[in-house]
Amino acid sequence: MRGSSNRKIDPRIHYLVPKHEVLSIDEAYKILKELGIRPEQLPWIRASDPVARSINAKPGDIIRIIRKSQLYGEVVSYRYVISG
């Protein structure tokens, strides 16, 4: 392929990709307690997702996603990392 190389592109630098961060165990416990749910009840994200890979998320981790919104300022959501 023309121009191919072994460079890896970090998907987090694209302006449409919201901020993703892996929660610590304490943060995850606090969020789950606030929401009154088990981790498996959160929406899922696969460990093979490009952003999950770029932040080194492992199955069982919980990711906080912070999106900027013109209407609401910031919208925070959470994802449970599954294998795959």
Curated annotation (Swiss-Prot):
Quaternary arrangement and interactors, per the entry?
Part of the 13-subunit RNA polymerase complex. Rpo1N and Rpo5 form a cleft which docks Rpo13.
Q: Which organism is it from?
A: Saccharolobus shibatae (strain ATCC 51178 / DSM 5389 / JCM 8931 / NBRC 15437 / B12)
Reactions performed catalytically: RNA(n) + a ribonucleoside 5'-triphosphate = RNA(n+1) + diphosphate
User: Family assignment?
Assistant: Belongs to the archaeal Rpo5/eukaryotic RPB5 RNA polymerase subunit family.
For molecular function, the Gene Ontology terms on record are: DNA binding; DNA-directed RNA polymerase activity
Recorded protein name is DNA-directed RNA polymerase subunit Rpo5
Under which main EC class is this enzyme filed?
A: transferase
What cellular component GO annotations does this protein have? cytoplasm; DNA-directed RNA polymerase complex
Q: What does this protein do?
A: DNA-dependent RNA polymerase (RNAP) catalyzes the transcription of DNA into RNA using the four ribonucleoside triphosphates as substrates.
Q: What is its EC number?
A: 2.7.7.6
Task: Identify the NCBIfam families for this entry.
Answer: PRK09570.1
The Gene Ontology biological process annotation of the record reads:
transcription by RNA polymerase II; transcription elongation by RNA polymerase I; tRNA transcription by RNA polymerase III
Q: Does the keyword Protein biosynthesis apply?
A: no
Q: Which gene encodes it?
A: rpo5
Concerning PROSITE patterns, the annotation shows:
RNA_POL_H_23KD (PS01110)
UniProt entry keywords in alphabetical sequence: Cytoplasm, DNA-directed RNA polymerase, Nucleotidyltransferase, Transcription, Transferase
Q: What PANTHER family does the record tag this protein with?
A: DNA-DIRECTED RNA POLYMERASES I, II, AND III SUBUNIT RPABC1
